[in-house]
């Protein structure tokens, strides 16, 4: 029963991650023929992050590795479909952005400014701010590294 419920949760997570990936791809004017690939790549990225987190990785490292995967697949698909990799990758990583951590940090900052300094609120603010910043950094670095590796002009040695 455990593996079936895990696979169901994984499929649900991937399906729900594909929806905002397509939505943001439409906002970014991605061609209609590429929308399904943006959805698939968003689902792959979010699903791989969920698998890594359930395997014991923390969310920052899981996000970094998932962004590496999304960037690598996006570069390969861009070669196949003769499109820029950002068409596939940028909309695909948006479902992995840390909305809850950033929101909690913002609310903590507002509460500190409204009610005054509180050690609990400051700890909540700093921990959530650092978590959100780390995840955004992991997304941006993980998305850019495959391009640096695969489009390198000079020899590595």
From Swiss-Prot:
YjjPB constitutes a split-type ThrE family transporter. Keywords: Cell inner membrane, Cell membrane, Membrane, Transmembrane, Transmembrane helix, Transport. One of its GO terms (cellular component) is plasma membrane. The transporter is composed of YjjB and YjjP. It is a multi-pass membrane protein. The keyword Nucleus does not apply. The chain crosses the membrane at residues 10-30, 55-75, 87-107, 129-149. Pfam families: ThrE_2. One of its GO terms (biological process) is succinate transport. PANTHER family: SUCCINATE TRANSPORTER SUBUNIT YJJB-RELATED (PTHR34390:SF1), UPF0442 PROTEIN YJJB-RELATED (PTHR34390). Involved in succinate export with YjjP. Both proteins are required for export. Participates in succinate export, but also in the export of other dicarboxylates, such as fumarate and malate. Contributes to succinate production under both aerobic and anaerobic conditions, and increases fumarate and malate production during anaerobic succinate production. Belongs to the ThrE exporter (TC 2.A.79) family. Its main location: membrane. It is found in: Cell inner membrane. This is Probable succinate transporter subunit YjjB.
């Amino acid at each position: 029963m455990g593996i079936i419920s895990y696979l169901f949760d994984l499929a649900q997570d991937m399906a729900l991650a594909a929806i905002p990936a397509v939505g943001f791809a439409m906002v970014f004017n991605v061609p209609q023929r590429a929308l399904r690939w943006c959805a698939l790549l968003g689902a792959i990225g979010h699903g791989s992050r969920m698998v890594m987190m359930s395997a014991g990785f923390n969310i920052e490292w899981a996000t970094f590795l998932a962004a590496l995967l999304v960037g690598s697949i996006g570069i390969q698909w861009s070669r196949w479909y003769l499109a820029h990799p950002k068409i596939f990758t940028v909309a695909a990583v948006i479902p992995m952005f840390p909305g809850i951590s950033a929101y909690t940090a913002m609310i903590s900052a507002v509460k500190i400014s409204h009610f005054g300094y509180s050690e609990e609120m400051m700890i909540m603010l700093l921990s959530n701010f650092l978590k959100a910043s780390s995840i955004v950094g992991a997304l941006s670095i993980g998305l850019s590294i495959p391009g640096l590796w695969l489009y390198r002009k000079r020899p590595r040695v």
